[in-house]
Design a protein with these regions (language model features):
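Class I S-adenosyl-L-methionine
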Residues: 1-288
């Protein structure tokens, strides 16, 4: 059954975007201001001032929220997220359902709820649950530290809404107690291996798997922090992040490795390439 949309001008609608270099263009994303809409944030709590963009980290911040860094750098990003937040605040769950429904692009079949931000109250969480229920042909997914809202509706989550508990919040104890599928930020591949977790590089484990997983630290981190040191170590190993430029660089390396005959590679270079490229091959997909 098609959902009839109200006729609204763009300024009255929420703003969604196509996925970035990490996620791919098949994923649509929705965001709110980092920190300001995250009642469960603790270890990643960071906020970019709405007017100036200046970053303020929370007292317990261990790694800076990458979304707050984006807002600090890009005023348009900051403005868009506050636009969405202002439209939603103060509305009933039913009003939010209507607003979200009216704002969803017709072609959007895979939607990430919150590249930035989180479920800021129970009514808002309930609204997304209902939107997912009204759109069985679409897949929705989210990372969240608002586990108390999830717990309140634990038995009412539709199959097409994939929730991932994000470690490092004020309600972490609920993850183990209720066996929520979860995502944990790690500082190295070795740490992920020690925890028995696969690293998700493109969100596919977030929306397609039922198992918990890890996310590799990225973004801009506070100088001198453990997260900053871990990021520096990763870069020394060749990790360049998720930007399109990084994808192109890896893709070109992979193409060169594939085309150059074996006789032109020394044995130790060949062995090193064969060890690293299985981990990086996914990263150039869609570029070459």
């Amino acid at each position: 059954m098609k959902i009839k949309k109200s006729i609204l001008v763009k300024s009255e609608l929420l703003k969604l975007n196509r996925g970035n270099a990490k996620l791919g263009k098949n994923i649509w994303t929705f965001s709110l201001p980092a920190g300001f809409s995250c009642p469960g944030a603790l270890e990643c709590l960071s906020k970019a001032n709405r007017d100036t963009g200046k970053i303020a980290d929370g007292p317990n911040t261990k790694f800076r929220c990458f979304a707050a860094s984006d807002e600090a750098q890009y005023k348009n990003t900051r403005n868009q997220r506050w636009h969405n937040f202002e439209l939603l605040k103060g509305k009933s769950s039913e009003q939010m359902v209507k607003l979200i429904q009216d704002s969803l692009p017709q072609k959007a079949s895979l939607i990430r709820i919150h590249v930035s931000g989180d479920f800021f109250n129970q009514n808002y969480f309930d609204a997304w649950v209902e939107v997912a229920r009204k759109n069985p042909g679409r897949t929705f997914y989210a990372y969240t530290k608002s586990l108390h809202f999830w717990l309140a509706r634990k038995d009412e989550i539709p199959e097409n809404l994939a929730l991932n508990a994000s470690h490092g919040g004020t309600h972490d104890w609920l993850i183990e107690k209720y066996q929520f599928k979860s995502a944990k930020v790690v500082f190295s591949e070795k740490e992920a291996e020690e925890k028995g977790l696969k690293i998700d590089h493109d969100d596919s484990l977030a929306y397609h798997s039922r198992d918990s997983f890890a996310l590799l630290i990225h973004g801009t981190q506070p100088a001198g922090s453990l997260a900053s040191k871990a990021l520096s170590a990763l870069r020394k190993l060749g990790w360049t992040g998720y930007s399109r430029k990084a994808k192109i660089a890896v893709a070109m390396l992979f193409l060169s490795f594939s085309l150059v005959p074996d006789k032109y590679w020394s044995p130790w270079v060949r062995e090193g390439m064969e060890n690293i490229f299985p981990k990086l091959k996914y990263f150039g997909q869609g570029i070459v």
